[in-house]
């Protein structure tokens, strides 16, 4: 009963059913988990395999997303199972999902989507509860995602790394922490709370000096440390993201011989388990690992394992699991074996453990597959180097042959081949080391029947001839080797040392021409004696001829002539014909189907067929987008290739070459890469230029496997590079499929990433389909083929022939060494070995002759010595060659000259080497480390090891300082100019704000000027009465009030000075802004840039250098002092020694030596001079006598050894020559002794100070001694005793004085030494802090350089806005100046017009009876000639309409329009007065024309200023936006800078952060604050208090002034009220009512008011009648418009109906037109005419509508001008 059925489409369901999946992917890391005590789970291809550990039975859980299964994880409760899958890319793909299954029910509980783009590579549940699931994606995103899987929600996500991640695990001890590891990295994660929320923060482990390694396994220890594996076999202990210690075995051996693939912590047993590629599981003491500390001289620690269990010798272990009780392990190796290790209850684990192999499965990528023609047996070649015989129905491994090298090529041998013993299954395999092997299946397994190393590199392809008699092997080194396959091993080649190759008989090899590429596949030509056709990775087919049978290969297998005989054929395929897209839906879909495949292929990837498809929208949108893309690609391809359908050569690799059985000379070819050639299988005829398409391939990946089955090859089996398998029925044998035929069956059986199909085959009875791929899986499917496609019954029923040992040829010696010679190298080496053997034999014979001659000569010498002295021959007569001595002396001289030259060369070499070392180690140093000892005690102080500041650093520092100074100067200059400009702008702005606009303050000031001028003129002329003067005075007062009120600011006005003061106070408040505040924005002057940071770093580096250099100067000065002190002390000690001698002489019987020792004892420990470590440079250059003596001894020893060797080499012939040389060696001794004595003598100079005294004591003569004894016997007199006592006291005084002086000198030096040491300690701390600050600065500099580009863009934007603003401000200022000038001029003009009016009042007083008529004449507007500055002709007249439009006087006087009548002097009026009024009118009109012109100019300037102000507001808004972006950017930059960790050393008294009176364990929330800043803030508080007190006093004074002003205001208001009351009382008393003075003025000044009222009434009646007439006309036109609108609507409806009818008629005509004659030209012409008529009708109606609308608008206007 099949476990599952794969139905690829509903049409073809039931064709194939999956029965089993053989293989185990043990090469994938972390791919084995325990579900329960008896079940393990592993992923392979698209299945999750459930393996029973007790029976070896397998169950399968199929994948759901079609791309394979990527990872698996088990819930801590073992009731749930998480499976992360892979999804094939495409528009319909929703991406891979993580499915949560229940166990053991295997039902889907939850589905997690959106965690990665293509595939999952690792999964893990957290802790004991398992509430959180961690998933890691594969290429291209590598996303680490944390899931709340119960809610199917993503909690956090981050990119794990940029390379493959092998595993992920939560910390079992610390919540919120997890670890990932993979290719070249390990990363430690924690869920951290930041100011933007919860985030995943990952710290990458830094390998430092340890070699970078892939981390396949890791385990976390309880204290947070992590133990990880390496590729080299060591264990790394991580602590805080750094390697704490590297663990090795004793002897610096790695923990395992090979990579460590699994780690396990057995906490109850207190041990750590590790499994490696050496087949062993080693146990390590947990305590020793956890507490491991590195040695002082190394970063490693040697540990001995507690025990080890040998699982399997030579097995590369890949997984290690332990059951819940910890008493059984489950182990897997890379060969596909699964073991259980039962641990003993007590005693040593290594001895008591029982290892049981549970199951053996094929593992590793499958390189080839061969199915038996008789039984259900297959030969499977795995890439791990193992060839297996497999019963694919039961899954049992029948036999296997393993080699240490990978299998890179595979081909089966036909049963008729001579190399198949007894017709048994035989296959040829090629390996990575260039070896070709033949294996035949026999009764005992797989027998090796042939082996030969043909190539230096890997074997790329193998091909066997149709008759099975020849084999060709192509290697990656560009060589092609031909073998003959024989039934029996061939005899040797006759060359000794050549190995036997079994059934492989080497024939010859050729080298391919350069540029041919690497061979990927091959096939033999069908013709008898034909050569080989080889496909390459460059898309070419090479025709290689067969070497001739008579080729001489005695000296070499190479056939040099064959290289030039190789011919090449380029695979050229026709370009696909892309059909043009039609608008119809069905046609569009077909076009998408046909052309879309090509487009998808162009975007695909070679490996795995992966595609980077974007997320599409709806189906229709996707189709439209693809159609547009296809059209664009078609156009581009047509332009590039000259049109679709042209030839196209492929540059991808050729994957397979097969002879077409039904057509001699034709090849079936499949190609890789991308493009059209990889989409199909092709039929290639070598004589034709183009290949013909044979079968449609796959849209996502190239065809990698092509086979035929069924009767006459009518069934094609295809496999793709991304794991798809297809069965295709063919229309003809070995031909193509029927047009439009769909696949018989197709399924994604293998992994989409690593599942390149490498083998397909039907069983001999057609009941099964077997597939193999690079993912290591072998799928067995039951087939239910149609009868016409089922293969015929087998003609060879029965069991597989298995020959016994007797029927097999002798096993040839296998080639296992990686450095073994190839066949060609073996042949060449064999000849060289033969020549070496002959030379050695010849040398041995010569040595034997020499030995006989030497023995004969020694016998003659002995006989001569035994003869009587008289009969003895002199030794000279026994010299064999008398000229030998002269030859030897000449040879000695020659060798001496050679030695001299060699010595000179060696001396120069040593000098250059020393100079190079000096240049490398010392030239860059300004001062090296020097130690200075104190004179008393063991205190030492050292210098700073200071490197010179490089010239580049100094130049960069100088340039940056110069740039900083230039920038500061430019900024100061810009600030000065900006301040002046700002003040000017503020002043102008203030004037503009308080002055109002032209219609406000300007008009008020103009009225004030007019009123003032009129009043002054009237007063001066004396012609006005008092009423007129009072009226003019009131107008002036009103104008003054208006002007005053115009200058009053509104309630929203803010003084610029106040705003500037507030901003200055806010800026200089003196508070301390915390940079950790998320809203903190760094001030402009404090913002860091890469240049500022680099300058600060350089200045800090220079300061550190200067500090160290200054200290070193003090140090060397103190060293000079020590040298001088020691010199002075030596002098004083010599004086003390003389005093000791004098004291001994004074005391008489005292021992002088004892006295000197007593005197010098306090200073016995003083050095005689500076020590070598105190003068390293001088000591390095100095060569002492001891060094010379040691060198002489070494040289003598070398000469002795050389002489001994020379004497031994010459044998007995050197006896006479060696004798006279012996005394010379002995004669060298006196010279050496003299040198030593000289050295000793020179060494005694230091103690020469005491020499004279001792010499005096030892140099007494006998008489002096007798005299001394005699004097000693004579008793001393009192004088002598007194003199002796005086001498003793004098000596003691001098001794104490000298001792005190020496002690004072020593103490002074030691005090200076102590002070210098204390200073060094402080400076060293400062220097280290500065160096740490440099490191922090470097990190900040890197961040600043990352942000610099964005900041530059923002600064450029802001500067552009500032420039625009400044330009606008300048324009506004210029415009304001112009306005002010125009206003002043306007006021003058208004005053001049007022003077004209006042002159009129003087000419025509109020009492004049003709005043009203003359005033009307004065104010009348007349047509005047336009005055032009240049004179000349032209149109001088203009209409008074322009005056009416351009002027608006706004006066209260009557403004009569010219009625067109003739103007005459009023009857009875004086003609001179009339003419004078006309002249004044002309003056008034001139002034009003100028006023109108100035008013127009002022209005233009005002509008221009308003436009500029509006533009300024827009620019300021843009500047504010840029400043906001800059502030956000600065916040982001400061946030990143805040993340840089800074080390601050604090003492306990500096920590003032207590919780409940105790220091908390976590200080992450505390704030580190500078004491200087704290003091500054405290001082600033005092300053602010003082400022507040001053401001309060100023405020109090202002309030007092304000109160005084209020009192003055109240007094003035009371005075005004008093005056108003008095005026009211006076008016009531005189007139009985309050007089309205303005009304009185108007009444008194307008005598014709009643007349004007009558005229006004008449005009109103006339205008009312005219208005009524126009309203009637408008109503009539409106009715007409409604009628026309309805008619137009009816026409439009008719047009719409006619258009619909036309379309229906066209559809009917189109449907019934097939077969009828129709003239398309006439139809087209009729359609055009009808459409033109409709367009003309619509245009006419639109024109009529526009005309009616225009009439309506004209009728609606009430201000229609008579001049219009």
Swiss-Prot record:
GO terms for biological process, alphabetical: cilium-dependent cell motility
SMART domains: WD40 (SM00320)
Keywords: Cell projection, Cilium, Coiled coil, Cytoplasm, Cytoskeleton, Flagellum, Repeat, WD repeat
Entry protein name: Cilia- and flagella-associated protein 44
The UniProt record lists the keyword Chloroplast: no
Acidic residues biased stretches: 629-641, 1434-1462
Sequence ranges of the WD repeats: 115-157, 160-199, 208-248, 255-294, 361-400, 454-493, 495-534, 649-692, 707-752, 753-791
Example of a GO cellular component annotation carried by this entry: motile cilium
Keyword Cytoplasm: yes
Function: Flagellar protein involved in sperm flagellum axoneme organization and function.
Family of the protein in this entry: Belongs to the CFAP44 family.
InterPro entries from the UniProt entry: Beta-prop_EML_1st, WD40/YVTN_repeat-like_dom_sf, WD40_repeat_dom_sf, WD40_rpt
UniProt-annotated location(s): Cell projection, Cilium, Flagellum; Cytoplasm, Cytoskeleton, Flagellum axoneme
Comp. bias (Basic and acidic residues): 585-596, 604-628
Region of interest (Disordered), ranges: 570-654, 972-1003, 1426-1468
